């Protein structure tokens, strides 16, 4: 059991049976008031950011998540099948854990998966992936005012790309911001 004074980025907490990852924390001192710790936390069940205040030296339950590297194989019904790259176990990941990241999954993509015991709580894609452009819209009605156009990637993701990108090009994409980085 740790205390609120020991909060550091990357630490995982259990609060009301929910897991949170500490993104940042700062000690706040107010005139004629009691100082406290203000933390930005990421809810691992839905990836939403929340702010929480803790009293100084307040006991907190820190937990250890196990990080495993998984390679995407294929979707299977409402779940996604991955292969643990270390022990070669197959792991079924529920759709709600993968939601929001599905459009970047293709066979062979390696992700980080975070487990608490045997339960998977979160997955994290690599920040950058190289994907093939399956289709681009080049007609004037689909062009955006900023000169970009919409491209549909091999995984089904839709992103804005510069006008010179064509079907069949391989591009580097930022999976966190859904942005085009460069042609490969």
Swiss-Prot record:
InterPro entries, per the entry: Elong-fact-P_C, NA-bd_OB-fold, Rib_uL2_dom2, Transl_elong_fac_P/YeiP, Transl_elong_KOW-like, Transl_elong_P/YeiP_cen, Transl_elong_P/YeiP_CS, Transl_elongation_fac_P
GO annotations of cellular component type: cytoplasm
GO annotation (BP), single: peptide biosynthetic process
Species whose genome carries this gene: Protochlamydia amoebophila (strain UWE25)
Recorded superkingdom: Bacteria
Protein name: Elongation factor P 1
Record PANTHER family: ELONGATION FACTOR P, ELONGATION FACTOR P (EF-P) FAMILY PROTEIN
Function: Involved in peptide bond synthesis. Stimulates efficient translation and peptide-bond synthesis on native or reconstituted 70S ribosomes in vitro. Probably functions indirectly by altering the affinity of the ribosome for aminoacyl-tRNA, thus increasing their reactivity as acceptors for peptidyl transferase.
Localization, UniProt: Cytoplasm
GO MF entry, a single one: translation elongation factor activity
Lineage, top ranks: Bacteria, Pseudomonadati, Chlamydiota, Chlamydiia, Parachlamydiales
């Amino acid at each position: 059991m740790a205390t609120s004074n020991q909060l550091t980025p990357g630490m995982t907490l259990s609060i009301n049976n929910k897991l949170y990852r500490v993104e940042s924390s700062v000690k706040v001192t107010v005139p004629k008031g009691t100082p406290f710790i203000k933390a930005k936390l990421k809810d691992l069940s839905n990836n939403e950011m929340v702010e929480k205040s803790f009293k100084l030296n307040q006991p907190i339950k820190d937990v250890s998540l196990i990080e495993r590297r998984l390679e995407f194989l294929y979707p299977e019904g409402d779940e996604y099948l991955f292969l643990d790259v270390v022990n070669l176990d197959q792991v079924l990941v529920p759709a709600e854990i993968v939601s929001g990241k599905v459009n970047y999954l293709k066979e062979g993509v390696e992700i980080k998966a975070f487990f608490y015991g045997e339960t998977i709580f979160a997955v994290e894609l690599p920040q950058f992936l190289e994907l093939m452009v399956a289709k681009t819209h080049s007609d004037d009605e689909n062009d955006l005012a900023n000169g970009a156009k919409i491209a549909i990637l091999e995984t089904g993701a839709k992103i804005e790309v510069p006008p010179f990108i064509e079907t069949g090009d391989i591009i580097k994409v930022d999976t966190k911001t859904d942005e085009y980085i460069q042609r490969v």
